[in-house]
């Protein structure tokens, strides 16, 4: 016998969270909980403002329609990426497809203070990997900060994310301030330039490896082995169903590319599922999930070891 609940929620964010020039004061989303007999499965639907095509309200309408269809016996999935992902996660839990084992390591997000990063990395098992957002300030400053971190911590590898912020000139200004001897320890730089061609040229000219992120969601993108391209960053909330995520991971691995499962600032419930997806589909690759510290609370399922308060399901607003 099938049954379902849908919950709507809103989590206050820390004051300094800015996405594409917009301050994110709250993270808004939905949960779906599906039941079939004794089995239960949860999924999170939280479109990311400025990145997702769909709004929270559109996702809510699509989710409620899909849940009602599912209760009538339908087996399809919604079209909207965030709704497709959340619904497919709930189904994967319900049917036991999504393994329980999780990779709760997360590449720490670094603000540029090497002393702070040294402390955070000290507790990190395995290879020392951190992530730095670049492109928010002057390219020269970014280059100096990255160089300082790599110089201060000799076994550190950095993942950098520019979100297509730079012109070719700005990208070159950044590279100029990174010692060529340290560049091999830049694991990859996500989307340095506004166009893929400019990003490819940057990789060839500087020897700094790049990764595709936004490009994966563009209609003309195809997976291919290219000089200077080392990785793809997959954000399931922006990608779509679990099957689509699996297809992208498989396509990347077939070309020898690293596939990194990455957060779209989901709640703790969604992040714990992404940690399970990472352990399942990209074992051995550190996922990019260090975003819970941007929030003021956890919900339903806490992240292991995190001290933030965790709201229970009966504290959420129920829609269905």
Swiss-Prot record:
GO biological process terms, semicolon-separated: menaquinone biosynthetic process
CDD domains: OSBS
GO molecular function, one term: O-succinylbenzoate synthase activity
Residues at which Mg(2+) binds: 161, 190, 213
Catalytic activity: (1R,6R)-6-hydroxy-2-succinyl-cyclohexa-2,4-diene-1-carboxylate = 2-succinylbenzoate + H2O
Broad class of enzyme this protein falls into: lyase
Pathway stated in the Swiss-Prot or TrEMBL entry: Quinol/quinone metabolism; 1,4-dihydroxy-2-naphthoate biosynthesis; 1,4-dihydroxy-2-naphthoate from chorismate: step 4/7; Quinol/quinone metabolism; menaquinone biosynthesis
Family, per entry: Belongs to the mandelate racemase/muconate lactonizing enzyme family. MenC type 1 subfamily.
PANTHER family: O-SUCCINYLBENZOATE SYNTHASE (PTHR48073:SF2), O-SUCCINYLBENZOATE SYNTHASE-RELATED (PTHR48073)
Protein name as catalogued: o-succinylbenzoate synthase
Organism, scientific name: Salmonella typhi
Lineage: Bacteria, Pseudomonadati, Pseudomonadota, Gammaproteobacteria, Enterobacterales
């Amino acid at each position: 016998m099938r049954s379902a609940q849908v919950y709507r929620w809103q989590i206050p964010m820390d004051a300094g969270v800015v996405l594409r020039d917009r301050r994110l004061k709250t993270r808004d989303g939905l949960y779906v909980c599906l039941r079939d007999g004794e089995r239960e499965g949860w999924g999170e639907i939280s479109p990311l403002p400025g990145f997702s095509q769909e709004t929270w309200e559109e996702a809510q309408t699509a989710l409620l329609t899909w849940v009602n269809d599912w209760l009538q016996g339908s087996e399809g999935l919604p079209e909207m990426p965030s709704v497709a992902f959340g619904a497919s996660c709930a189904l994967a839990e319900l049917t036991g497809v999504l393994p329980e084992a999780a990779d709760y390591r997360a590449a720490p997000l670094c603000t540029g203070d090497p002393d702070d990063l040294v402390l955070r990395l000290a507790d990190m098992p395995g290879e020392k990997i951190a992530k730095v957002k670049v492109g928010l300030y002057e390219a020269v400053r970014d280059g100096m900060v990255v160089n300082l971190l790599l110089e201060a911590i000799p076994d550190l590898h950095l993942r950098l994310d520019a979100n297509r912020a730079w012109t070719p000139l700005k990208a070159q200004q950044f590279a100029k301030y990174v010692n060529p001897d340290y560049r091999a320890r830049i694991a990859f730089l996500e989307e340095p330039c506004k166009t893929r061609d400019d990003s490819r040229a940057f990789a060839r000219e500087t020897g700094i490896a790049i990764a595709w992120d936004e490009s994966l969601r563009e209609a003309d993108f195809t997976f291919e082995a290219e000089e200077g391209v080392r990785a793809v960053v997959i954000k399931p909330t922006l990608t779509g169903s679990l099957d689509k995520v699996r297809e992208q991971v498989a396509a990347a691995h077939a070309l020898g590319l690293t596939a990194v499962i990455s957060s779209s600032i989901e709640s703790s419930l969604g992040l714990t599922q992404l940690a399970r997806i990472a352990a399942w589909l990209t074992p051995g690759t550190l996922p990019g999930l260090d975003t819970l510290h941007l929030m003021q609370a956890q919900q339903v399922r806490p992240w292991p070891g995190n001290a933030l308060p965790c709201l229970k399901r009966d504290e959420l607003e129920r829609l269905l």
